[in-house]
Amino acid sequence: MSAPEAQQQKRGGFGGRNRGRPNRRGPRNTEEKGWVPVTKLGRLVKAGKITTIEEIFLHSLPVKEFQIIDTLLPGLQDEVMNIKPVQKQTRAGQRTRFKAVVVVGDSNGHVGLGIKTAKEVAGAIRAGIIIAKLSVIPIRRGYWGTNLGQPHSLATKTTGKCGSVTVRLIPAPRGSGIVASPAVKKLLQLAGVEDVYTQSNGKTRTLENTLKAAFVAIGNTYGFLTPNLWAEQPLPVSPLDIYSDEASAQKKRF
C-alpha cells in the first residue's frame, strides 16, 4: 500500500467527508423535560405553598401556565366536542385549517372551555386542551328544595348569551337528570351538575356559540352573593404576599 492510500485509510477511507469516523455524538435526549415554572404563581404551586385551586380563585390570581391546573386538579378530564374545517380565501387560493372545540372538567365543580384553530387536527386539539385548562372556572352548586345530602343542582337560575344563542339553566329536583342537548349535557356533566333543566333560544345549531352561552351561564353562578353569604368575612392575605420571597426566586443560570 502506497503512502497516500495509507494516509487516507488512517483518515477514515476514501469517499465523503468524515466517512468512517466514529460517531462522537451521544444519543438524543428524548426524555421530556420537567416543568420549570416561569411565573410567581407557578413557583408557589410547584413548591407546594398553594395546594388547592380555590386559593387562586379566592384572590383572582391569573393563571398563565396550564401545568398549574394539572397539578391542582389531577382528575381533570377532556372531551373534544367538535372538529370542523374552516377556510380563508387568499391570493394563492383557499387556505384550509381545522377548528377544535374542547371541554375539560373534573365533575366536581370545575370546568373549562377551549377553542383553537390550527393547520392540523392534532395540533388544534392539543392547543384547545391547553386553552380550556387556562380558562377553568369554579361552579357554585346548590339544591332544589331542602338541603339534604350533597349539592346536586344549581343554586339559582342563570342565563348566558353568545351571539344569537341564549341558554338558561333552571335547578331541578333530585333524580331529574340533565335535560339538555348532548353538547350542553356533556359540559354540565364535566362541571359536576347532576340535575338541571335547560332552555335555549337562537341559532343553536352553531355548537360553538351554544357551548359558550352555557359556559357563561354556569360561570354566572359566582356572579352574585346569595343571602347565606351576606355576612362579612375578613379576606385572607394573598399567597403572593405571604410567600413573596419564594415567588420572586429566579432559577440560577450558569
From Swiss-Prot:
Subunit composition? Answer: Component of the small ribosomal subunit (SSU). Mature yeast ribosomes consist of a small (40S) and a large (60S) subunit. The 40S small subunit contains 1 molecule of ribosomal RNA (18S rRNA) and 33 different proteins (encoded by 57 genes). The large 60S subunit contains 3 rRNA molecules (25S, 5.8S and 5S rRNA) and 46 different proteins (encoded by 81 genes). Interacts with snoRNA U3. Interacts with MPP10. Component of the ribosomal small subunit (SSU) processome composed of at least 40 protein subunits and snoRNA U3.
Which GO terms fall under biological process for this protein? cytoplasmic translation; positive regulation of translational fidelity; ribosomal subunit export from nucleus; rRNA processing; translation
GO cellular component annotations of the record: cytoplasm; cytosol; cytosolic small ribosomal subunit; nucleolus; nucleoplasm; small-subunit processome
Region feature Disordered, mapped onto this chain: 1-34
Q: What domain of life does the UniProt record list for this protein's source?
A: Eukaryota
Transmembrane spans:
none
The record's annotation in PROSITE patterns points to:
RIBOSOMAL_S5, S5_DSRBD
Write out the similarity annotation.
Answer: Belongs to the universal ribosomal protein uS5 family.
Question: Any idea what this protein is called?
Answer: Small ribosomal subunit protein uS5
Originating organism = Saccharomyces cerevisiae (strain ATCC 204508 / S288c)
Q: What does the protein in this record do?
A: Component of the ribosome, a large ribonucleoprotein complex responsible for the synthesis of proteins in the cell. The small ribosomal subunit (SSU) binds messenger RNAs (mRNAs) and translates the encoded message by selecting cognate aminoacyl-transfer RNA (tRNA) molecules. The large subunit (LSU) contains the ribosomal catalytic site termed the peptidyl transferase center (PTC), which catalyzes the formation of peptide bonds, thereby polymerizing the amino acids delivered by tRNAs into a polypeptide chain.
Q: Which GO terms describe its molecular function?
A: small ribosomal subunit rRNA binding; structural constituent of ribosome
For this protein, what post-translational modification is recorded in UniProt?
Answer: N-terminally acetylated by acetyltransferase NatA.
**Which keywords does the record carry?**
Acetylation, Cytoplasm, Isopeptide bond, Methylation, Nucleus, Ribonucleoprotein, Ribosomal protein, Ribosome biogenesis, rRNA processing, Ubl conjugation
Stored InterPro entries = Ribosomal_Su5_D2-typ_SF, Ribosomal_uS5, Ribosomal_uS5_C, Ribosomal_uS5_euk/arc, Ribosomal_uS5_N, Ribosomal_uS5_N_CS, Ribsml_uS5_D2-typ_fold_subgr
Residue positions where Asymmetric dimethylarginine is found in the record: 11
Give compartment(s): Cytoplasm; Nucleus, Nucleolus
Matching Gene3D superfamilies, A to Z?
Answer: 3.30.160.20, 3.30.230.10
